[in-house]
Amino acid sequence: MWGGRFAEGPAAVMREINASIPFDKRLWQQDIAGSKAHVAMLAKQKIVTEADAAEISRGLDAVAAEYAEQGVPVDLALEDIHMATEGRLAELIGAPAGRLHTARSRNDQVATDFRLWVRDAIDSVEAGLVALQVALVTRASEHAASVMPGFTHLQVAQPVTLGHHLMAYHEMIARDRSRFADARDRLNRCPLGSAALAGTGFPIDRHMTAAALGFDAPTRNSLDSVSDRDFALDYLMAATQLSLHLSRLAEEFIIWASQPYGFVKLPDSYSTGSSIMPQKRNPDAAELVRGHSGRIAGCMTALVMTMKGLPLAYSKDMQDDKPPVFEAHDLLALSIAAMTGMVETVEFVAPRLRQAAEQGFSTATDLADWLVRIADIPFREAHHITGTAVKLAEREGVALDKLPIEALKAIDERIDERVYQALSVDASVASRASYGGTAPDQVRARIAEAKAALGIEG
């Protein structure tokens, strides 16, 4: 490949540290697609003959068939997927294989391959996220009016509906989809034809290869084209944000499945047992999703540190761009699939959710709001009165709506029997009818919008 410049071959350790074929073999489909587009363009531009181009294309198809059936053989002497493919092509078709690399460098070749791979990865993630959103919306529609406690600081705060809670995750995933879509749009420029860094003297048609590979256009600066790994960082940053959202939902399932909470029962198919404690049903799938989020964030940090301070154009450091992306994608795909399965099959224990909502004085804010609306008391004063009522209820060991009217009047004489209409969890939830609030009608309206966007009937 480049031996003409050197008087001796690489040391064994150099061969090992230099080789990327053990991991970049995952790019074989993209590498062959890029090569076929490149040779078709070379023929059109009369840089290679039609006969040689046809032979090269046929040979590439044969190599692809071998890879699909047998996998990519790992030979450190061949260094990377590009040379492995070109080497096998030469074995199959002979001399014409040597013309494939005309007007191309491995710098623009790998930049193209990697963009194609990340684009495919984004499309795969998008399909998984749609399935997760469908699961969330479907379960939310079953529980649009099911009351549960809303929390702040993991303390009971105000009643909400389970449907409202699940739709919060739908919104998070919608933002994640938007981030991946933005990343896809930015990466969809083709660097092929930038060559090593300065472009090429051959009369190539970069627009042709860009179109053939499904890119919107060729990139506009050859130096940037071979140096750029923003698209990989964009993917990892979007993946990290998504993994944080999945981790939050996983954490809630873990907490909710514990005996003190008892809000959910995770199915056996997403749980494991204990080697010593026969009674255990451990939420291992959720815990692994939570754990994977840390590894995905680590992958993002790894590539950030690799790219920090690199001069233009290509440096060998950039060979380490692919392992963190591959690892993050594999972990993310597993996490999305596992979380979708859990959402689809988890059993929500509605009576326990309601019971928990009725504890912890979750309607205290409703008492304060009632004092503002009905008794025309400034909110800060109403807040103080309500705090006194909560302290009394806590001392007596009863809920706010179980305090006798005499006790409430003793706190403030402006309170009357009408206050009890505001103190039930159902009344509290129904009153939160502002746009985007937890009132069942609002939740159902947001569910209907989500179903329309996702193409869900009913």
UniProtKB/Swiss-Prot annotation:
One GO MF term attached to the UniProt entry: argininosuccinate lyase activity
Domain of life: Bacteria
GO biological-process terms attached to the record: arginine biosynthetic process via ornithine; L-arginine biosynthetic process
Gene Ontology CC terms: cytosol
Claim: Cytoplasm is one of the keywords in the record: yes
S-S pairs: none
Enzyme Commission number(s) of this protein: 4.3.2.1
Biochemical pathway: Amino-acid biosynthesis; L-arginine biosynthesis; L-arginine from L-ornithine and carbamoyl phosphate: step 3/3
Pfam hit, one: ASL_C2
Locations listed in the record: Cytoplasm
Keywords: Amino-acid biosynthesis, Arginine biosynthesis, Cytoplasm, Lyase
Catalytic activity: 2-(N(omega)-L-arginino)succinate = fumarate + L-arginine
Annotated family: Belongs to the lyase 1 family. Argininosuccinate lyase subfamily.
NCBIfam families, sorted: argH
PANTHER family documented for this protein: ARGININOSUCCINATE LYASE
The name this protein goes by in its record: Argininosuccinate lyase
Higher taxonomy: Bacteria, Pseudomonadati, Pseudomonadota, Alphaproteobacteria, Sphingomonadales
Name of the gene this protein is made from: argH
